[in-house]
């Protein structure tokens, strides 16, 4: 795939919004320190120089990856991107209930994959990885917000409120019109108003 021709941050960098625009990222570069840490065999497929065997995927490798993420986020925030990261914390029991509902509700069957059960067996390993991610990558310029997510409505409210609170820290302005256009606003308005 094209992604494997680049470093692990490339696909996220090219997906960043233009200045003045918003984007929501689901399944971000944190997959590269989550899924690949739970399944380090996936790292071999990334064709990283010096990483040829599972023994090459060391603690130093993960430290470097966290540092790359922190440097990436520092770079983009320095250049005007506002980064707000949410970890939707779901209990194991709530995850079980949601998976059961997917199986019991025909219109939601499509959301289920047998792989969900295999990954669920690795719950504790995922929790350890989440803890590492939160501890090693929550920075003042790119903080993590841990959201209790067993109740969807509550989680959505907290996320929306957090986004609003974070954006209210900034003073945003609409783009300015060129003087030539601004000086002729009344003329443009009159022209449109007089159309029949």
Question: Would you name each region that the model predicts?
Answer:
Residues 1-3, 28-32, 40, 89-96, ...:
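Conserved nucleotide-binding/hydrolysis micro-motifs of P-loop NTPases
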Residues 1-61:
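Conserved nucleotide-sensing/catalytic segment adjacent to the nucleotide-binding pocket
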Residues 6-9, 63-74:
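A Trp-anchored, charged/polar loop motif used as the substrate-binding/catalytic surface
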Residues 14-18, 75-81, 137-139:
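Conserved catalytic network of the ASCE P-loop NTPase/AAA+ motor domain
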Residues 23-26, 83-87, 146:
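A structural signal for short, well-ordered beta-strand segments and their strand-loop junctions
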Residues 37-66, 76-128, 177-182:
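A glycine- and Lys/Arg-enriched "phosphate-lid" helix/loop adjacent to the NTP-binding pocket
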Residues 70-73, 77, 131-134:
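Structural signal for well-ordered, non-membrane alpha-helices
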Residues 105-108, 122, 126-196:
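NTP-dependent small-molecule kinase module
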């Amino acid at each position: 795939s094209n992604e494997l021709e680049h470093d692990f941050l490339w696909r996220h960098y090219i997906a960043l919004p233009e200045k003045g625009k918003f984007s929501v990222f689901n399944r971000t570069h944190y997959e590269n320190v989550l899924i690949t840490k739970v399944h380090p065999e996936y790292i071999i497929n990334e064709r990283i120089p010096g990483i040829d065997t599972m023994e090459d995927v060391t603690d130093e490798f993960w430290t470097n990856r966290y540092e790359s993420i922190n440097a990436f986020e520092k770079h983009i925030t320095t250049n005007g991107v506002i980064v707000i990261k949410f970890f939707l914390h779901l209990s194991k029991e709530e995850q079980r209930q949601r998976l059961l509902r997917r199986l019991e509700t025909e219109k939601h069957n499509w959301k289920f994959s047998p792989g969900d059960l295999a990954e669920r067996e690795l719950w504790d390993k995922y929790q350890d990885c989440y803890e590492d991610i939160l501890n090693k990558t929550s920075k003042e310029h790119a903080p993590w917000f841990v959201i209790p997510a067993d109740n969807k409505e509550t989680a959505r409210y907290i996320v929306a409120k957090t986004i609003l609170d974070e954006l209210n820290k900034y003073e945003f302005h609409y783009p300015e019109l060129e003087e030539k256009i601004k000086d002729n606003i009344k003329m443009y308005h009159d022209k449109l108003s007089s159309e029949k």
